[in-house]
Amino acid sequence: LKFGTAGLRGILGACINRMNMYTVRKATQGLANYILKQNGAEKGVAIAYDSRHFSPEFSDEAALCLAANGIKAYVFDSLRPTPELSFAVRQLGCISGINITASHNKPQYNGYKVYWEDGAQITPPHDTGIMAEVEAVSDWASVKTMEKQAAIDAGLYQVIGAEIDDAFIETIK
């Protein structure tokens, strides 16, 4: 499964050419490497997901990879629309956002879209920089992860929800 300009999108399944926890972890490790090179770890990453199969699980896999790299993950407590993720990235002052979604694709698909600190999908030079970092992750053993409770205890995994919802709704009124 190849990381493109909008991220990943593919059929769910076991293999390196499918969407699964391993491809999500690899993409996130590449994103984490890029964020670390940008000195953006302290800003954190907001993560949202949709109602597709395994979206909540992929959201957690991404968050735990970020946390293992010392990057705080702000994870929505349930599914949220893409515009709210964009808002959350800006509201929380994050360097990036991840949306676990395959958008308009068929139900057997899922995806992984990356947003930058302006709340928009990644554009040059960040898109090519992140793609290069993802492609550079060739050793699966180099992909970091950690236990969820350890990430919470370390302050690197924070659940978000109503406070962002309220601010988002107030902003778009």
Task: Describe each region flagged by the PLM.
Residues L1, N110-K173:
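Gly/Ser/Thr-enriched, mixed-charge loops and adjacent short helices
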Residues L1-A62, A154-K173:
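An N-terminal, well-structured beta->alpha segment
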Residues L8-G10, C15-N17, R52, R80, ...:
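Short, glycine-/Ser/Thr-/acidic-enriched flexible segments
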Residues T23, A27, P81, H126:
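Catalytic-loop motifs flanking and including active-site residues across diverse enzymes
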Residues G40-E117:
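Ferredoxin-reductase
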